[in-house]
Amino acid sequence: KQAKLFNVKNLVIINKKSFEKFKEKNNNNKLNIYNDFESLSKIFKKKIDYTMSSIIGLDGLKPTLDIIKYTKKIVIANKESIVCGWNLIEKELKKHKTKFIPVDSEHFSIWYATQNKKNNNLDKIYLTASGGPFLKRSMKKIRLSDALNHPNWKMGKKISIDSATMMNKVFE
């Protein structure tokens, strides 16, 4: 749906099953579908303006590292890749002169605050949190279904558990 909505010309789907399924359903001559990032080198004469990296968990780190050389700016919505692989990401960013913009709210706020030359003398940054949905409940009485039941939206199991247990704050 998004590829059609934004008139995407090139799409990379790394997961082989998803790639085959999508390609079968979208036999559109206007859309080039690839199964690896190396294929992009064949079609790009110059760098892409923006790339969004939003694969959940550490699965997003390798594709993020692979695409950096093909893009002017990489927008990363994957906090696990930033936290666990920042030294690798930063090395590739410098090597390929690619700009970085984090999308996750806490990472974006910190990044944005440090972009202002007046704020370059920051010593500490404090990240606050509500305490989560189980702050005043006994852990013995909390069930898996409680943690998976987000009151506002469906986020999938991993993100719901990370949110309910405050693990997302560790990554942030």
Predicted feature locations:
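N-terminal glycine-/serine-/threonine-rich beta1-alpha1-beta2 phosphate-ribose binding loop
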Residues: K1-L58
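Short, contiguous clusters of charged residues that form electrostatic/catalytic patches at enzyme active sites
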Residues: E38-S41, K62, F108, F171
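A generic secondary-structure micro-motif detector
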Residues: S53, N78-K79, M166
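A short hydrophobic/small-residue beta-strand
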Residues: K73-I74
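Mid-domain beta-loop-alpha active-site segment that forms a flexible
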Residues: D104-S109, N152-E172
